[in-house]
Amino acid sequence: MAANYWVSTQRRHWLFTRERLADIREGFKERDKVAHSQFPLPDQRLLNIYFSQQLIKLGKRTTTRQQALATAQVYIKRFYTKNDIRHTNPYLVITTAFYLACKMEECPQHIRFVVAEARSFWPEFIAPDVSKLGECEFALISEMNSQLIVHHPYRTLSELTPELQLTSDEVALAWSVINDHYLTDLPLLYPPHVIAVMAIIVAVVFKPSQTSFHGSAGPALAGAMRDGGVNLLAALGDKNGNGPPRIQKLVGWLAESEVDIKAVIECTQELVSLYEIWEQYSEKHCKELLGRMVKSKNLDK
């Protein structure tokens, strides 16, 4: 596998500007105004939360590694930069992305087992015929131009842990923040090292009183990031050595590094927006809207 992100297809072909992503999505809407009017869907971030929860269900019995689930989430995002979700069966796309990601992350699952697992959760949307998943896999690979290697922020977090002397609690929280960033557009907007640095800063600056984190950091961090603690922008802008030594050390490291601080701040703001809209999330609502869309358009056939 390509170890160097800087020469990767991810950097060359799968990083977008916010404007480009908005144009792509607006283009889908313009090309099929009727479908967009007939089948309204929740905010993309709420859909991402729903998709993530479905992937976790798929991976639970096989104890699939988090990195494979993260790769699957990136595949889904990439696929939907080329295809309007209203013309697809999202449950088949989720299942196929999971199957393909497991192969790429060297924890493969048998196709029949994956289909059986998916049918145990969504029998009305997944056909028993494994060839359907095979066809969708071909489409997924084709839409991504066979560019299947994904570089994740977890590696940078591991590399920076000893250098920044992060505590186990800080590492756990940063890991959870990285998990959460897959629920946003950030994997399509910024390099993985920027995401990792953002997660570390959030873990150190906004560290809540909880001592353990599992999966998502959202509930624990939402209030801290929105309402108080240390203001991140002030912390990053403080060149006078004020504030807690722990944070000043991090600010000093950032100043000496070549990390784009503006990008880190933008990533943090995106995370705050995610945690704010998370309060509106309803699994039932997402399931109902997607189910009506798939059934009405016969996308489950």
Curated annotation (Swiss-Prot):
Q: Highest taxon of the source?
A: Eukaryota
Q: Which GO terms describe its cellular component?
A: nucleus
| Any GO MF annotation of the entry | cyclin-dependent protein serine/threonine kinase regulator activity
Q: Which CDD domains match?
A: CYCLIN_CCNC_rpt1
Domain (Cyclin N-terminal): give its ranges: 53-142
- What are the record keywords, sorted? Activator, Cyclin, Nucleus, Repressor, Transcription, Transcription regulation
| Pfam annotation, one family | Cyclin_N
Q: Does the keyword Transcription regulation apply?
A: yes
Q: Is ATP-binding included in the keywords of this UniProt record? A: no
For this entry, list what GO says about its biological process.
regulation of transcription by RNA polymerase II
Entry's localization field: Nucleus
The job of this chain, per UniProt, is described as:
Component of the srb8-11 complex. The srb8-11 complex is a regulatory module of the Mediator complex which is itself involved in regulation of basal and activated RNA polymerase II-dependent transcription. The srb8-11 complex may be involved in the transcriptional repression of a subset of genes regulated by Mediator. It may inhibit the association of the Mediator complex with RNA polymerase II to form the holoenzyme complex. The srb8-11 complex phosphorylates the C-terminal domain (CTD) of the largest subunit of RNA polymerase II.
Assigned protein family? Belongs to the cyclin family. Cyclin C subfamily.
User: Assembly state and interactors?
Assistant: Component of the srb8-11 complex, a regulatory module of the Mediator complex.
What name does UniProt use for this protein? RNA polymerase II holoenzyme cyclin-like subunit
